[in-house]
Curated annotation (Swiss-Prot):
This is Adenylosuccinate synthetase. IMP binds at residues 13-16, 38-41, 129, 143, 224, 239, 303. Homodimer. The gene is purA. One of its GO terms (cellular component) is cytoplasm. It catalyses: IMP + L-aspartate + GTP = N(6)-(1,2-dicarboxyethyl)-AMP + GDP + phosphate + 2 H(+).
Amino acid sequence: MPAIVLIGAQWGDEGKGKATDLLGGRVQWVVRYQGGNNAGHTVVLPTGENFALHLIPSGVLTPGVTNVIGNGVVVDPGVLLDELKGLEDRGVDTSRLLISADAHLLLPYHVAIDKVTERYMGNKKIGTTGRGIGPCYQDKIARIGIRVADVLDREVLTHKIEAALELKNQILVKIYNRKALDPHQVVECLLEQAEGFRHRIADTRLLLNTALEAGETVLLEGSQGTLLDVDHGTYPYVTSSNPTAGGAAVGSGIGPTRITAVLGILKAYTTRVGSGPFPTELFDENGEYLSKTGGEFGVTTGRRRRCGWFDAVIARYATRVNGITDFFLTKLDVLSSLETVPVCVGYRIDGARVNEMPMTQSDLHRAEPIYEELPGWWEDISAAREFDDLPAKARDYVLRLEELAGAHVSCIGVGPGREQAIVRRDILAARP
């Protein structure tokens, strides 16, 4: 059976949690393959209960699904334990959550360095969440990181943390004038936290590949979005990992030939959190409308998201770099009651029309959107469950976005609830 990748096709916050939740009842495994608690998924159950998840895969809310925090994720132990407790206090069974032995641990010195660095950068800062994600990935690449499996051996763990803090404390004290961290305290705190998750540590690569060989279906859930990818995003205003489809194989240990479908999540308009270029950003009453009606505030940071019209240039780019086979278009209901809905179909850069993603960031910063005006609709579409239930103008909008983005819009979100979705093509049944 297949492995299916679910990725954000914009700058994150597209509604990936809703998509995972919709598919979750028909897959056996849900895997988070990159990122950390710098991203959030919101899932609204049919009961009206609202769950905000940061580290734990959205499949935890679906009974019978085994959830995996993959080797590509950076795990803050305190956040993990708090999130588990929050779920368990609300009656959610978390017994089927596993953590890759090779995932990296995010520790207090990562957070400290992240925060002081952003403060030091001032107006030149990237706009990170300040949760230590970047510094943790830096340690991973520098080969001085702490892996989840290290908590199983006190001696190894102590040696690694002492070695890491020799450098980190020099940075904190001599560059940023902060207090040094005590390696003994860091070790003891981590070992105490590990008591709450050591039973979840597993060789998840082996388990996932064995599951695929046994005919089970694996859903690989990315966090953030394509334009935040460290290689393919709007660098340097990006995250420190690869949310794109290629990162799914690396961050889970599943071979790329196992992946049979890539589901891109697209919001019916565009949002972004933090600094960086955003050609269709709105600063008028339309931006206010999208922000207020769409509830555009970050799940993790609480920061207000920047809002703009749908950008077909970045949608096409996402289709290309991810090999997207299907789209899930979310928040179509937010656009109801607009007289017209502009869609960016290209850019004008220094007087010349550009239809594809600019090669340089300086060009993207200068890009002016070229809009195609589509007629809006006034009807409430939140109760639509079939494509034909939508007003004709809403259907036309979806079909035009499908044409511009270059892949089939297989699902459409018309509200925050699990059941508020239209399925035009069954993602799982359509796969070989």
